[in-house]
UniProtKB/Swiss-Prot annotation:
Source superkingdom: Archaea
Subunit text: Consists of a catalytic RNA component and at least 4-5 protein subunits.
Top-level EC class: hydrolase
One Pfam family per UniProt: RNase_P-MRP_p29
MF terms in GO: ribonuclease P activity; RNA binding
Gene name of the record: rnp1
Family stated for the protein in its record: Belongs to the eukaryotic/archaeal RNase P protein component 1 family.
GO CC annotation: cytoplasm; ribonuclease P complex
Name under which the protein is recorded: Ribonuclease P protein component 1
Free-text function comment from the UniProt entry: Part of ribonuclease P, a protein complex that generates mature tRNA molecules by cleaving their 5'-ends.
GO biological process annotation, one example: tRNA 5'-leader removal
Record's keyword terms, sorted: Cytoplasm, Endonuclease, Hydrolase, Nuclease, tRNA processing
Reaction it catalyzes: Endonucleolytic cleavage of RNA, removing 5'-extranucleotides from tRNA precursor
Length: 111
């Protein structure tokens, strides 16, 4: 399945370009690079100069560039936990709901 703004939290983030928009550590704000590692609680971002920096997911807001070139804002709480845990959360969604991202609304159903 293709990574989109609507399902990005249920995919691996490794390989995506990322920018830290907000975080509890002021020294990491504005950090930009490629996600090279993902754990339950953090992302490791490799910058252009080759530095690898660990950023905690909690209390952070990220901007990810999708493979098609568009950018999506994701709160750290949405990507908290391992990929398997995030997919389990998807399985617990019931019925019809709304996903809201970047000022748009899209209806989803669990089928």
């Amino acid at each position: 399945m293709k990574r989109t703004a609507w399902n990005i939290v249920f995919h691996s983030l490794i390989g995506l370009r990322a920018r830290v928009l907000a975080t509890s550590d002021p020294g990491l704000r504005g950090l930009e690079g490629v996600v090279v590692e993902e754990t339950r609680h953090s992302l490791v971002v490799e910058t252009r100069d080759g530095r690898r920096v660990r950023v905690l997911k909690a209390n952070s807001i990220f901007l990810f560039q999708l493979p098609g070139g568009s950018w999506v804002v994701v709160r750290g709480e949405e990507i908290a936990g391992s990929l398997a845990e995030r997919v389990k959360r998807l399985g617990r969604l019931k019925g019809v709901g709304w996903l809201v991202r970047a000022g748009e609304k899209r209806r989803y159903t669990r089928g």
